[in-house]
UniProtKB/Swiss-Prot annotation:
This is UPF0149 protein VC_2476. HAMAP family: UPF0149 (MF_00346). InterPro entries: YgfB-like, YgfB-like_sf. Belongs to the UPF0149 family.
Length: 191
């Protein structure tokens, strides 16, 4: 079960920064979750080349960072097909005003990279159901939200938590439509 756990945000942020990769943990998880939700199979290793192209001008990643990305991919794959319908988003945690602004930025980055991941995986969004199109529109709108310094920050923190829950629901709708279902993700036959 430990293989299905997400890495800790601060440790992964440090690992990505040390590797000079232009992506943060929220963006990476959003990208990989979008790719899975768009139909990427765990048996398809093309995700690595797509991630390298998208984040590092086609150059490979250090082994540690790649292992962390694979850990995220495995964890999210398990969460997306779990009957509990629970998703864990890899977002920064903290207290105070600065942490709230950082969280809001990370949420927007997560969504934008999720949408990019859908596109990279080749999801045919033009032929999506009404529900899937609405979920995608909601995500696009939520990616534009921000924190207003003039308003009550406690109230905005609560609203941001509601937005995060709605993001999860939208992701599950899109994965239900485009993602590989467990019975579709079969292992190759060995002779």
């Amino acid at each position: 079960m430990s293989k299905n756990r997400l890495p800790a945000y601060p440790a992964l942020a440090n690992e990505l920064r040390t590797a000079s990769l232009g992506i943060n943990p929220a963006e990476l998880q959003g990208l990989l979750t979008g790719m899975l939700s768009g139909g990427l199979s765990l048996n398809d290793k093309s995700w690595q080349a797509l991630v390298f192209d998208y984040t590092n001008d086609g150059m490979g990643w250090p082994i540690g960072a790649l292992a962390s990305a694979e850990q995220i991919l495995l964890a999210m794959s398990a969460q997306l097909v779990d009957t509990d319908f629970e998703l864990s988003l890899l977002l920064p945690e903290g207290e105070g005003e600065e942490a709230l602004f950082e969280l809001a930025d990370a949420v927007a980055e997560w969504i934008n990279h999720f949408i990019s991941g859908l596109g990279l995986s080749g999801a045919n969004l033009k032929h999506a159901s009404v529900e899937a199109k609405e979920a995608l529109e909601d995500l696009e709108e939520m990616s534009k939200l921000g924190i207003d310094e003039e308003d009550d920050l406690a109230e905005q923190a609560e609203l941001l938590e509601q937005v995060i829950e709605h993001i999860k629901a939208c992701v599950l709708v899109l994965h239900a439509e485009f993602g590989v279902k467990p019975e579709q993700d079969t292992k190759p036959t060995v002779h």
